[in-house]
């Protein structure tokens, strides 16, 4: 099953997340099909906190991909700010 979820990156105590489309059986930070955005929870100043390609997310959902709870909230906030 294809899912859209967060893959953690960054350093210790400094998380940075990629929003990825992946097979649900793959490891959290493992192989993915497509990167559709990022989320930086520690963004300060002019740093961008969230970038999401909503068109690609909607494409994958139309293809049957499931969305994690956290990513669903990020999609909602991305649509609201756009």
UniProtKB/Swiss-Prot annotation:
GO terms for biological process: translation. It comes from the Bacteria. One of its GO terms (cellular component) is cytoplasm. NCBIfam families: S16. The keyword Ribosomal protein applies. The lineage of its organism: Bacteria, Pseudomonadati, Pseudomonadota, Gammaproteobacteria, Enterobacterales. One of its GO terms (molecular function) is structural constituent of ribosome. Belongs to the bacterial ribosomal protein bS16 family. This is Small ribosomal subunit protein bS16. Keywords: Ribonucleoprotein, Ribosomal protein. Pfam families: Ribosomal_S16. It comes from Proteus mirabilis (strain HI4320). Signal peptide: none annotated.
């Amino acid at each position: 099953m294809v899912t859209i979820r967060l893959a953690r990156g960054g350093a210790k105590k400094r998380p940075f997340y990629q929003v990825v489309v992946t097979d649900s059986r793959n490891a959290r930070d493992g192989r993915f099909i497509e990167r559709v955005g990022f989320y930086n929870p520690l963004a300060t100043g002019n740093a961008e906190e969230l970038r999401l390609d909503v068109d690609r997310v909607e494409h994958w959902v139309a293809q049957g991909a499931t969305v994690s709870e956290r990513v669903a909230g990020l999609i909602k906030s991305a649509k609201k700010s756009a």
